[in-house]
């Protein structure tokens, strides 16, 4: 910024072909020194400026000389003492080289050459976009608006290093080649603005005021277009938006999910009541605008709550879910299913996690907080047995379906709290027979009768894991624990517990799943070293 201000100030200066600057100074010992400097700037000025300075010299060789060249850049040299080179100011886009100074007893001759050279940024560093998102100050969703992507990665790298670096080596963060429109899940809240205009977008940070958004740089473009057209259809079909204050109205939210590889699109209409007038005609009109839509689901949320989705659902078009592929497996994604929003970076993250597990085909693994079974099913072909546990019943049903869809027969799924499940496994190994309920809802034979586990994958929510889970991991003592985290702070807290109880953190790999936000994913390998 200092360079820019100097450049702006100097551009306002009047420069003639030959400019003479005369400075008078008082000299002791009646010594006068005349110093002439020629400056050539190839980018702006091809003239020679003569600078005559009369400097005061005290005693032997102490010279104070201030020379100022007014050009596109500003160079100030302060020299004190003998044969001492000083660094010069380096404007953006210019490279400055200075010849060696020759100092005589009462005179200094210095030649400074300004050579304009375009400073080329490395291929890995792209220039920051000049235009910020038009919703940046209202939406609040993207924490890093105004920062170049390279700067964002450096910030996240430091964030992970600060929290995890004390436990193990932190590898350089893996960023995206194209950090735009990566979100395969888009949610919009609907409202009426002053004047009766239908708007949709997100809540303004800290409020329930809706910020109207037509398009978002991190959201799937197809999803944004569908949401915009739904706004228009509401007017045509005279469907009112839901009013949170009064409880009147129908449409509350719209959720759009799109398969990155499959291209399948699911639209979820969240209503305040179970009846959508002219629903068939509405779907027909919507699909006429967007034939890529493969399914439409009505979700009923008739409670005054901040939750987006309600309990009841009805499929009004298509199969009620979409499918997509990840790391070679096909996954079923329902309206409520947890599925990472950035499939490109998720493949990188999960591939690294399975690499850390060091599977040989003989291991019994636990996939805790499994969601729809992604990590465990991807790892199944490299393991002897997979035991997956998830609290969300709908997600577990999808996981069971996904195992069948991929013809995976060595995986079993349990609908249970991960912490309690691990406690029971540890107790069972200690000959206390407490069996969890399988996902089918029927009591069945224990998946691990001896309670032995070789590898644990854990991917908890932002709050991290809990002591019940972690203490059970310590009791079961698997050889390796692969911890996937979306919060470096809670990750550090849990690593502290595990490292105090026989585990050593070996390596951490940060992966940027959420460009333009402060959030970052990390995967850590932990090895059991004994108590």
PLM regions and their residue ranges:
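Flexible, glycine-/basic-rich loop-and-beta segments that form/coincide
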Residues: 127-133, 209, 529-531
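Extended interfacial segments that mediate partner engagement and assembly in macromolecular machines
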Residues: 140-241, 261, 276
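Short, aliphatic-rich beta-strand segments
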Residues: 256, 263-272, 330-334, 455
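Intrinsically disordered, Lys/Arg-rich low-complexity segments
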Residues: 2-124
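Rossmann-like S-adenosyl-L-methionine
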Residues: 3-8, 278-280, 284-288, 292-531
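Short, solvent-exposed loop/turn elements at beta->coil junctions and helix N-caps
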Residues: 172-179, 244-245, 253, 257, ...
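Immediate flanking context of iron-sulfur cluster ligation sites
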Residues: 122-138, 169-178
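Short, acidic/hydrophobic/Gly-rich beta-strand patch recurrent on exposed beta strands
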Residues: 201-204, 268-270, 399
């Amino acid at each position: 910024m200092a360079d820019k201000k100097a450049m702006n100030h100097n551009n306002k200066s009047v420069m003639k072909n030959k400019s003479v600057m005369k400075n008078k100074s008082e000299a002791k010992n009646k010594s006068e020194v005349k110093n002439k400097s020629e400056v050539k700037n190839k980018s702006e000025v091809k003239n020679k400026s003569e600078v005559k300075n009369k400097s005061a010299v005290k005693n032997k060789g102490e010279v104070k000389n201030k020379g100022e060249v007014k050009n596109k850049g500003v160079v100030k040299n302060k020299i004190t003492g003998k044969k001492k080179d000083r660094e010069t100011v380096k404007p953006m886009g210019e490279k400055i080289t200075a010849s060696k100074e020759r100092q005589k007893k009462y005179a200094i001759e210095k030649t400074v050459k300004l050579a304009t050279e375009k400073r080329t940024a490395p291929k890995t560093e792209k220039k920051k976009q000049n235009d910020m998102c038009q919703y940046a100050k209202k939406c609040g969703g993207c924490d890093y608006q105004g920062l170049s992507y390279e700067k964002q990665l450096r910030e996240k790298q430091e964030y992970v290093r600060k929290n995890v670096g004390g436990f193990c080596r932190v590898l350089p963060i893996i960023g995206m080649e194209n950090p735009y429109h990566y979100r395969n899940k888009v949610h919009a809240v609907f409202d009426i603005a002053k004047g009766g205009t239908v708007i949709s977008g997100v809540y303004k940070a800290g409020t329930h005021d809706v910020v109207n958004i037509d398009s978002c740089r991190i959201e799937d473009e197809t999803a944004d277009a569908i949401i915009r057209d739904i706004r228009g259809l509401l007017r045509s079909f005279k469907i009112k938006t839901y009013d949170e204050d009064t409880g009147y109205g129908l449409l509350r939210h719209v959720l759009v999910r799109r398969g990155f590889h499959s291209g399948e699109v699911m639209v979820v209409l969240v209503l305040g009541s179970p009846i959508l007038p002219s629903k068939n005609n509405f779907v027909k009109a919507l699909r006429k605008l967007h034939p890529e839509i493969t399914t439409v689901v009505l979700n009923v949320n008739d409670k005054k709550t901040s939750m987006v989705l309600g309990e009841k659902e009805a499929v009004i078009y298509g199969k009620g879910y979409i499918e997509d592929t990840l790391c070679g497996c096909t996954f079923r994604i329902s309206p409520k299913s947890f599925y990472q929003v950035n499939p490109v970076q998720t493949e990188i993250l999960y591939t690294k996690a399975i690499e850390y597990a060091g599977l040989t085909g003989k291991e019994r693994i636990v996939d805790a907080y499994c969601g729809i079974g992604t990590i465990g099913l991807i790892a199944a072909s490299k393991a002897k047995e997979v035991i997956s546990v998830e609290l969300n019943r709908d997600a577990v049903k999808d996981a069971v379906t996904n195992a069948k869809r991929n013809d995976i027969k060595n995986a079993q799924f349990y609908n249970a709290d991960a912490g309690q499940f691990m406690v029971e496994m540890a107790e069972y190994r200690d000959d206390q027979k407490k069996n969890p309920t399988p996902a089918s809802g029927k009591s069945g034979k224990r998946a691990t009768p001896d309670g032995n586990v070789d590898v644990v994958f854990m991917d908890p929510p932002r709050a991290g894991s809990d002591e019940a889970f972690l203490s059970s991991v310590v009791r079961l003592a698997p050889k390796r624990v692969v911890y996937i985290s979306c919060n470096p702070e809670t990750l550090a807290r849990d690593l502290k517990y595990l490292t105090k109880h026989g585990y050593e953190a070996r390596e951490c790999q940060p992966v940027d799943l959420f460009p333009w936000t402060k959030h970052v994913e990390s995967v850590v390998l932990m090895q059991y070293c004994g108590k």
